[in-house]
Amino acid sequence: MENQEVVNQLAGFEVKVSGQPLSKLPEDLYIPPDALRVFLEAFEGPLDLLLYLIKKHNIDILDIPIAEITRQYMQFVDLMREMRIELAAEYLVMAAMLAEIKSRLLLPRPVVEEENEQDPRAELVRRLQEYERYKKAAYDLDQLPRVGRDTFIADAAVPPMNTAKIHPTAELPELLNALKDVLQRASLYNAHSIAREPLSIRERMSRILSLVDKENFIAFTRLFTVEEGRMGVVVTLIATLELIRQSVIELVQAEPFALIHIRAKG
């Protein structure tokens, strides 16, 4: 009887002994009740088990035969119990869910409710599809190169090098000649430092007023000179703004984007 159970469990699997296919167990084969069993499949949860059963039998995930899947699922649960393997509570919860879906599909339903009622398998299909996406993403991440598994950091110590230091030999006359040559080359480069004349904002204000008094109406650009550089631009601009603040001069413009002029205010 126990041998027959083993045969039933091997149904659907191709078993070979010494390279030859085995369709049935020898008649004189005795398998003790507590014989060693090797279970090769490992699942991360009930959804993983269901996905395995669906792929194993090439079942369309959108059209799951609940009765057949429930039967195979319960066979796995019973097998785990026979092998005294502790099952997580989530496996039993999934078994109850499958039984509920199976009963809802078998019970007759009114025509009105049948048109509006959602397929009892819809929630299970959604969870399976979502789990399959996460499982594929985890597999893709696992295939990425990983330090310590696929690549290893080289940790090779540099062998000690015992090399003798060779000190250069130089005589005093040679050093004096080298120093003389350096001094001669240094004398060829004479540096000249040129100090700029400091610019005064007060003086620039007086200069602007003098120009305005002479011509009464001058272009703003005439206040600046190229020779004074950026410092001259800054000083002239500050002086102009200070005179405008004191209401001594004003800026005028005939039209937008036209040339700006300065004239005395009043």
UniProtKB/Swiss-Prot annotation:
Disulfide bonds: none annotated. The keyword Signal does not apply. Keywords: Cell cycle, Cell division, Chromosome partition, Cytoplasm. One of its GO terms (cellular component) is cytoplasm. Its main location: cytoplasm. Coiled coil: none annotated. It comes from the Bacteria. GO terms for biological process: cell division; chromosome segregation; DNA replication. Pfam families: SMC_ScpA (PF02616). It is found in: Cytoplasm. Belongs to the ScpA family. Participates in chromosomal partition during cell division. May act via the formation of a condensin-like complex containing Smc and ScpB that pull DNA away from mid-cell into both cell halves. Component of a cohesin-like complex composed of ScpA, ScpB and the Smc homodimer, in which ScpA and ScpB bind to the head domain of Smc. The presence of the three proteins is required for the association of the complex with DNA. This is Segregation and condensation protein A. It comes from Coxiella burnetii (strain RSA 493 / Nine Mile phase I). The gene is scpA.
